[in-house]
Amino acid sequence: MKLKLRWKGHQRFLTRQNSLVGFIWSPLKNTFSKRNSILNNQVCFEAIKYIQRHYFSSQSHHVTYLHQSPLEKLVSNGVVNENGDLTMDSLSHQIYLLHKNRPTLPLKPTNQPTRFASVLMPLVNTSQGASLLLTQRSPNLRSHAGQMCFPGGRVEPSDGSHYYAALRETYEEIGFLPNFFTYLTTFPPLFTRDEKTEIRAYLAFSVQTSLPSLGTGEVKDLFYVPLTSFLNPKHQKISRFRNTDLLYVEFNIDKIPRIWGITAVILNMYLNSICPDALISIPKF
C-alpha cells in the first residue's frame, strides 16, 4: 500500500528511502562519499563502461525501443534501474548521455543579455520512481502568475555564480538546503522574448527524503512529477514557442497544471537527450 499525503487539495507522494541515502554529499568534492571512499559522480567512467558493455546492439535495441513503455525506455537507456529508481550508476550514465547528445537551440539572440537568471532541475527518488520537482508560481505575482516552473530566479551580484543563484533561490522558495544537492550538468542557455534575460538550467540530484516547505509567497504549490509521466504520449502536445518557428512539446498531465513555455523547452532538451525518440515529433534541439 502506497503512503500518500493530502496537501493543499492535491495528492502528494512521500519520497521513499532509496539506494543513495547511505551516501553523504561532500561539499569540497561536490560529489557522493561513503566512509572514506569518494565516488566521483560527475565522471563515473567505470559505471559508464559497465552499462555500455551490457547494452543491446544498437539495431535490435532501436526496433524494440519503439514499442516499449515509458519505464522500459528509461531502463533500456540506463536512466533508471529496473525498479525505476535513480542510482549512482544511472546518474553517471545520465551525465554521459547529456554530454553525448548535448542539445543545441536553433534560436540565437541578436543582442547581448543584460540580466541573468538560473533555475534548478531537482531529480529525486519518490514512491513513483525517478521524478523531477517543479513548482507552481503564485497567482498573485506580476509575471508568469500560476505557471509551472523549476525553482530559481534572478542572479544577484553577491551570488558568485549562476549555479549558486539557483541553489539560493531553491532554498528561499521551497526550503531545500544547497548541500542537499549534487550537481550533474548544465544546459545551453535560453533567452526571454525580448532577449534581455539569459536563463541557465542546472540538473542536480537530491537525497532529500521529506517534503520541503514553501519559503516565500512566490510559490503556490510544488509537484514531484515522475519521468514516466513526461514520456507518456497521452500527456504530450506540440506547441509553438512565443511567435517563433521553434516547435516543442508541452505537457498536460493529470492533476498537474499545464507545463509549457521555457520550462517545457528545458524538459524537451533533457528528455530528448536521455531518451531519444521518446517525445512525439519534437524538433531536434
From Swiss-Prot:
Q: Kindly list the cofactors needed.
A: Mn(2+); Mg(2+)
Positions bound to Mg(2+):
E169, E173
For this UniProt record, the keywords arranged alphabetically read as follows: Hydrolase, Magnesium, Manganese, Metal-binding
The broad enzyme category this protein falls into is: hydrolase
Motif Nudix box: residue span?
Answer: 153-175
Q: Name one Pfam family in it.
A: NUDIX
Q: Which cellular component terms (GO) are annotated to the entry?
A: mitochondrion; peroxisome
GO molecular-function terms, A-Z = coenzyme A diphosphatase activity; magnesium ion binding; manganese ion binding
Question: Which family does this protein fall into?
Answer: Belongs to the Nudix hydrolase family. PCD1 subfamily.
Q: What is this protein called?
A: Probable nudix hydrolase C6G9.05
To which species is this protein native? Schizosaccharomyces pombe (strain 972 / ATCC 24843)
